[in-house]
Structure formats: structure tokens, C-alpha cells
Amino acid sequence: MNKLLIFLSVTFCLNAWSASLSEDEAISKLNEFFELLDLKVYEKDNIEKILTEDFKIFEMGKSWNMDEFDTFLQEASETTISTDWDLSEYRVSLDDNSAHISYVNNGTFVNTDGEVIYSYWLESVYMVKEQGVLKLKFLQSDLVNREVR
């Protein structure tokens, strides 16, 4: 009987340990999203691999699914030479199958006419595990300040 209890305890602990998320895993997935958004490497098929099918992004007062967001990105890429995001001040909340992160995003965009746009956002992302893989389900972006030079 004691051996059975020990076996069940160890099995339960191993299952709980292997199923949980870490802050590093969640932050890494968020950073991967922004790396895949870089205009130099952006491909819709690649970014969709880390998104749920019902992914939504709320930005600039609009709600977009990935198809709509892709259209926006394609149009923006016609006048944008480079994109860069600096994420910081992560606040992470986790459970076994989901993660929520709020963070600061400082973005720099260089346009074809030489303008440099500096944007400061407060953002939030919700991620869920699907078949053991962490994916982005929802992203909220609130522009705090924008400066054009």
C-alpha cells in the first residue's frame, strides 16, 4: 500500500510539473510573435503557427482576426522600411494551461520617405496551450504616445 501511495504521489507530481508553464516560456512566445512580425521575415503562414485559430488583436480602435491584420500589415509594408519593437516591464500571470502578460512596447518604424516613428504602447496578451503548445489567443494594444521625426 505504501508503495502504491508513493507511486501515485510521484506520478501526480511529475504530471503537474510537466504540464505547467513558466514565465520564461510565456515571455519567449511573446517575443517570438514580434520577431515574426518583423517586415524582413514576415510571412502569414509562419506567424499563424503560434496563434490560435480564433486569434484576435485589438489595436488602433479596431478588432482584427489574423486575415484582417495581415491585410493591414501588407498595406503598411508598402511604406515601411523597417520595424523594431523593444518589450519591457513584463507582468506575468500563469496557470497550467494559460498565460497573461502585460508589458510596455516601444516601437520604432522607418518609412520610405525617411520619417522615423516612435510609438509607446501599453499592451496585454493572453496565451493558451493547445495540444501542449503555447499559442497567442488575444492581444490588446493601447497607444500611449507617438512621435514622428
Describe the predicted segments one by one:
Residues 120-149:
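Short beta-strand edge/turn micro-motifs at domain boundaries
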Residues 9, 14-50:
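Short, low-complexity N-terminal intrinsically disordered segments enriched in polar/charged residues
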